[in-house]
From Swiss-Prot:
Cofactor requirements of the protein: Mg(2+)
Record keywords: Cytoplasm, Fatty acid biosynthesis, Fatty acid metabolism, Lipid biosynthesis, Lipid metabolism, Magnesium, Metal-binding, Transferase
Entry annotated with the keyword Lipid biosynthesis: yes
Signal peptide as annotated in the record: none
Predominant location: cytoplasm
A molecular function (GO) term: magnesium ion binding
Identification of the protein by name: Holo-[acyl-carrier-protein] synthase
Length: 134
């Protein structure tokens, strides 16, 4: 059962300007260490950060809160499964909000797709409640 859907579209140039203007202050406030390591190693650094920013916005929308109600930027991080598929890892307020969405006897599956085509980056998040298998 789908319990949340979110999407976001962002201009990569906006993220690039913010990175130039605020540097590590912006990176440390918004992105996890894993996201920073991944993005800093990329040739298209601003596009990598923009996709991750869009993923966080989309995830916050799927949670039904936006960046509010105890959900902070660093509570949501883009990670990859062993096969390379992107997904979201939630902590803190985001993890608490996720638990509120889930019916009893279910676990969450967070589906994420991210893409970019300069000057835009886009993300879609679907949060699914799956029955717990005993």
């Amino acid at each position: 059962m789908i319990v949340g859907i979110g999407s976001d579209l962002i201009d990569i140039r906006r993220v690039e300007k913010t990175l130039e203007r605020h540097g590590s202050r912006f990176r440390d406030r918004v992105f996890t260490e894993i996201e920073q390591r991944k993005s800093e190693g990329r040739k298209q650094r601003a596009a990598s950060y923009a996709k991750r920013f869009a993923a966080k916005e989309a995830c916050a929308k799927a949670l039904g809160t936006g960046i509010a109600e105890g959900v902070f930027w660093r509570d949501m991080g883009v990670v990859n499964t062993p096969s390379g598929k992107p997904t979201m890892h939630l902590t803190g307020g985001a993890a608490k909000q996720l638990q509120k969405l889930l019916p009893a006897g279910t676990n969450a599956a967070i589906h994420l797709t991210i893409t970019d085509d300069f000057p835009l980056a886009q993300a879609f998040v679907i949060i699914e409640a799956l029955p717990v298998l005993e």
